[in-house]
Amino acid sequence: MKRRLLELDGVFPVVTTVFIVLLLTAIPSQGQTEDTNEWGRPNLEGIWLDVYATPFERAPELGDREFTTPEERAARDQALSSSAGRDRRGPPGSPQDVSGAYNAVYTSVKPTGPRTSLVVDPPNGRIPALTPQAAQDNERRREWRVMLMRNTPTCEQETPACEGGPYGPPSPRRFDVPPFYNTLRMNRHDGPEDQSLGDRCMLGATPDFNGFRRITQGEDAVAIGYDTGQGQGFQRVAYLTGTHPANQVRLRHGDSRGRWEERTLVIETTNFSPKFPFRGSSTNLTLIERYTRVDTDTLEYEVTIEDPTVWVAPWAIRQELKRQSDQQNRIYYEPRCHEGNYGLAAMFIGARLREAEFSEGRGPDPFSLDTTT
């Protein structure tokens, strides 16, 4: 097993998938069948993917309606395939043009799924309300991001990307240290801490609902490899023995302990790091995941998400995962991030050049430029 990154407590959502060709040949072990592995447990091994596009939350007007009609799915598929502006780009050479390098013309579109939302509990398909403290924390982060954007055309034109912030001169707080651990892209580029986790080649949170999942089973552990797209991904190991470590031990994707309940693999994950939050939840997050083999090509996945400091009630997601060809959809064993490895350094070089031009009177104030959205 690869060594996992440990840290001590107190230290401080449709994705494009990129494929790589590796030589992978599955060799059945003695006693293993299509449905059962050599230890007599359900065989969950393989590459699995949710092949449908499903809204994360249900539209409020649908109420408790769990499924769409064939006519609704056909209409949505038609709208996606012919959506205006899919080939739109910014002025050649502009920041908007460069940042939009992943033109939608070259991305695939999943067909619309039968469910009206991934969220199945509560019955209305909506994530429960935030606690007052979580809402306050979200507002504090939003205010900080907007503060760094206030002198840009984005806020001057009152576009949605300004998140309702006012237009005005650069804030005197723009050089301050953020009052929180940043995981999102900001309109400042002093160092890696100002960049998003994706820019820093640390994309992917647990749980993940978008990319491929490769499941590999052992006698006392189950490994799950995630491909989160564009050369990024991560590995998780759910141990079938032992207990969670002490509370002060924190892991990027938490500590996962699994057990079998008849034909279902149940994984409980705790001990998450504050540096890798899921929708604002981290150190108090608990996940209960359930993997159930439905048939040869179908795996049902359900996860219950609970953090009483963030949401007023637990909530659950359900997906139907389909087996993918091992030969046609091979994914990373060790994720790379070539764009980030080169792009992050280039971003800082460009930021320093802009600062030099401004100090010499040859260019605009960098804080008057939107280098975030």
Describe the function of each predicted region.
Residues K2-L6, L24-T373:
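PEST-like low-complexity, intrinsically disordered acidic/proline/serine-rich tracts
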Residues L6-P13:
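N-terminal Sec-pathway targeting helices
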Residues P13-A26:
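Bacterial N-terminal signal peptides
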